[in-house]
Amino acid sequence: MNLSDAINAVNRVKDIINSHNTWRRKETINLIPSENVMSPLAEYFYINDMMGRYAEGTIGNRYYQGVKYVDEIEAYLVDLMSKLFHASYVDVRPISGTVANMAVYLTLAKGGKIAAVPRQCGGHISHDEVGAPGAFGIKVIHLPCDEENFSINVDSAVKVIREEKPQLVILGASLYLFPHPVKELAQVAHENGAYLMHDSAHVLGLIAGGQFPNSLNEGADLMTSSTHKTFPGPQGGVIFTNNESIFKNIQRAVFPQLTSNYHLHRYASTAITAIEMMTFGESYAYQVRLNAKKLAEELSKYGIPVVAEARGFTETHQVVFDASKFGGGAKVAQLLEDGGIIVNKNMLPWDRSAVRPSGIRMGVQEMTRVGMGTQEMAEIAAFMKAILIDGKEPSSVKGEVKEFKAHYTEVKYGFKLSDVGIKCDCLPLNY
């Protein structure tokens, strides 16, 4: 490639990224429940020399030289996460929540059986036989759902655990409106020789802020998570436990069985986010729950069928509605995107096809982090009503959405660069 073509190619990359940054950061209402934004300070520390380095092994026991500061930042991050989530043992090396789950499977259930929430009831694909369990030859037994209440049928689940005797019971979900019965099922799991793992990916920030139960305090043997949803850090994974023997085996699963590089550059940003959650997490998590309730109530008021009304709609960051009467989840998700509102289609308990789901799943954690409160949730609901109930063309609503979003371009509940004396206009996102 000659220099002129190379510069054109670089400019194409630049244009694509700049367009994406402007669109998602400044022009759209982002309601994907599995996403969030880092603070400017966390973003600043995300770019560092560790992005090109290796540190196989564990703290103080590496297979590479030149890792003294890697050991220091990893140890500090482990200490922060241990204190924040009241866990004796923490592994921050998994590069995603799914890899964290895989490490648990390899340690406790390889070639055996696990019991988990089915996908149509909110279970994550990494808990399903079509995902990671199937790759390890693990049979997945489904925990029966309480479809009306968007929860687990405890009595039926107890029966399944006693009859099937899985090595591992998994709670937590991708569609997650209410706490799962950790205490009840942990006791039954232990009585039948099983461990219980709670996948806290969607609610980790709510746990940090005291707005959702910490499953380790309710009898769970392990807690896994990603680090970029309601916990608003960089993408990554983490495993928590208070069981030393399990932890040692987990460490061997993370390395050498599943990873050799842990994407070390994310450690600093994750540490900054942990400090932010220690400082602002309580008020952030509280506002997230208030906002989710308000959005659900406003949508329901307009005749949009938000699920779980009898239970108060939600106790997390998520809001879910049945989009069947509007043409289904895929159609509605596209209509809303055309209007500048980003959501995702999702299976509901009565669905049989992941390709044609009837549900829409939303989360308010990102919009809360840019300073939106309950009044803004009411305005978002009104935009959605205009498209879905009033039948307005999404393109006619898009401009209003863009103007509305222009007032919310600064991250709250976190640190600015100036808070720690850094003077820099070098961040590309300006959010």
Curated annotation (Swiss-Prot):
Key word Coiled coil present: no
Main EC class the enzyme belongs to: transferase
GO molecular function: glycine hydroxymethyltransferase activity; pyridoxal phosphate binding
Signal peptide span: none
Site residues by UniProt (Plays an important role in substrate specificity): 228
Pfam family, one: SHMT
Subunit relationships: Homodimer.
Function: Catalyzes the reversible interconversion of serine and glycine with a modified folate serving as the one-carbon carrier. Also exhibits a pteridine-independent aldolase activity toward beta-hydroxyamino acids, producing glycine and aldehydes, via a retro-aldol mechanism.
Protein name, as recorded: Serine hydroxymethyltransferase
Source taxonomy: Archaea, Thermoproteota, Thermoprotei, Thermoproteales, Thermoproteaceae
Gene: glyA
